[in-house]
Amino acid sequence: MKMNLKKKIIALAVLPALILGIASIVIALTTVKDSLIDEIQDSLQGTAAAALAAYDQNSGEYMMAENGDVWKGSYNISKSENLVDNIKSKSGMDVTFFYGKTRIMTSAMDDDGNRILASEAGDKIIKTVLEGGEEYFSKAVSLDGNLNYGYYMPVYQKGSTSEIIGMIFVGTDKSRKDAAINKIIWMIIISVILVMVLCVLASVLVSISISRSLREGIGIVQTVAKAVSYTHLRAHET
């Protein structure tokens, strides 16, 4: 009976700490991760908007010359290495300009140090951005075999709200971002576990103390009860 009471008290004290700890870990694995990915998306979107503004500030329409170069007025987008490289150096993100569905300028390099050009966007990107006119965030864009978080933004012809001539893409290395996210999540989980262990230990100690006090109280009551019973018995005998 005494052991059962002790176990019940410990369980009542420890259970809330365990539930709170588990709930905190679940939140860290879901809500916190989603929030961090949302921050990545917002950062990519902001950089894409800045890159698009840098191209759009040039007067004139987007057009392709006979030699295949793409221009915005008098600005040669196909030769805009300095612009995309400068954005990458400041933001840490790769920038790509698509004319139609084809990459014509990018800061992204392959393993040989060459720019990743002339490749085409995937069907889903074409349908969503080029045909649908929607911005698109992806958690897994492959650039020469390397996965990136990526953001696509449609590019409209000058003065038009319906003619889409291409896309701006901004990407950041997925493995590095995931490593940073996982580091934050593990720090939260470890902190929660440490606090949970301390709470459990404190709860056990308090529970043991309460159980001991209850046993002592019960013992005193039983002693008093026996004394009273004995007194009544003696009085009855006399």
List where the protein language model places each region:
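Extracytoplasmic/periplasmic sensor domains and loops in membrane signaling proteins
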Residues: 78-92, 107-143
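Glycine-rich acetyl-CoA-binding "A-motif" of GNAT/NAT acetyltransferases
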Residues: 164
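Short N-terminal helix-loop-first-beta-strand/juxtamembrane motif that initiates sensory/input modules
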Residues: 46, 50, 57, 84-104
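Polar/charged heptad-repeat coiled-coil helices used as signal-transmission/dimerization stalks
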Residues: 175, 179-186, 208-234
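A short beta-strand signature within small-molecule sensing/ligand-binding domains used
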Residues: 135-137, 145-154
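Juxtamembrane membrane-water interface segments immediately C-terminal to a transmembrane helix
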Residues: 29-53
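Extreme N-terminal signal-anchor transmembrane helix of membrane signaling/transducer proteins, especially
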Residues: 5-31, 190-193
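Helix-start (N-cap) segments at beta->loop->alpha junctions
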Residues: 145, 156-159, 169-181, 185-186
